[in-house]
């Protein structure tokens, strides 16, 4: 909401109150089959030797995009950002070799990762995830402080009475 505040009809920070967190989903730095190697370090070395030759894809202004900007800057690599509408567009492009790398949510990519169609090089969470225990975190891969989580939550108008927010929170937590 903050990146697109001028286009929104509400001020999310002023007009909404948080009720409960529903889900928190890490991203993974994923690579297509054309990338040699299986680690983030190998990917960065390959890209660094070929500056400006490769693209990455992420929705413009998204957590994925911002994390990739931070990662490419920290790694000293040059890549072209190709905006996407999300994992539904990015995953096929990775598998076809149209893009080399992406930062996309694990939930949308887990099937292709497990099937060996794409490679997970690192996850954006603070700890390794149970579904991909062999994949290091960005911090473990040498990039501490980079990485965000996708999350979903329930919000209500800011003027909602606290008693109602508390009850909705209780109900939400009981069902998540």
Task: Please identify what each model-predicted range represents.
Residues 17, 43, 117-130, 147:
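Conserved helix-loop-beta element of the AMP-binding
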Residues 43-51, 110-119:
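Basic phosphate/pyrophosphate-binding loop/patch that engages nucleotide-derived ligands
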Residues 84, 103-105, 123, 148:
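Short beta-strand and adjacent tight-turn residues that come in two discontinuous sequence segments
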Residues 5-11, 111-123:
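Extracytoplasmic "Venus flytrap"/periplasmic binding protein-like
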Residues 69-74, 88-102, 107-117:
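Short helices/loops that flank or line small-molecule/ion binding pockets
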Residues 3-89, 138, 149-173:
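Hinge/capping helix and adjacent helix->loop/strand transition within the periplasmic-binding protein
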Residues 33, 106-107, 125-126, 158:
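Short secondary-structure boundary segments
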């Amino acid at each position: 909401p903050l990146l697109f505040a001028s286009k929104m009809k509400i001020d999310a920070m002023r007009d909404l109150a948080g009720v409960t967190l529903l889900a928190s989903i890490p991203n993974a730095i994923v690579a297509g089959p054309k990338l040699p190697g299986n680690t983030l370090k190998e990917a960065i070395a390959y890209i660094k030797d070929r500056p400006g030759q490769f693209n990455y894809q992420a929705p413009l202004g998204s957590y994925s995009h911002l994390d990739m900007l931070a990662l490419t800057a920290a790694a000293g690599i040059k890549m072209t950002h190709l905006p996407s509408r999300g994992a539904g567009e990015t995953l096929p492009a990775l598998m076809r070799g149209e893009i080399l790398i992406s930062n996309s949510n694990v939930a949308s990519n887990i099937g292709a990762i497990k099937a060996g169609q794409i490679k997970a090089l690192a996850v954006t969470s603070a700890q390794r995830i149970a579904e991909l225990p062999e994949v290091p975190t960005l911090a473990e891969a040498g990039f501490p402080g980079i990485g965000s989580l996708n999350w979903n939550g329930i919000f209500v108008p800011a003027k909602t009475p606290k008693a109602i927010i508390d009850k909705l929170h209780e109900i939400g937590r009981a069902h998540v």
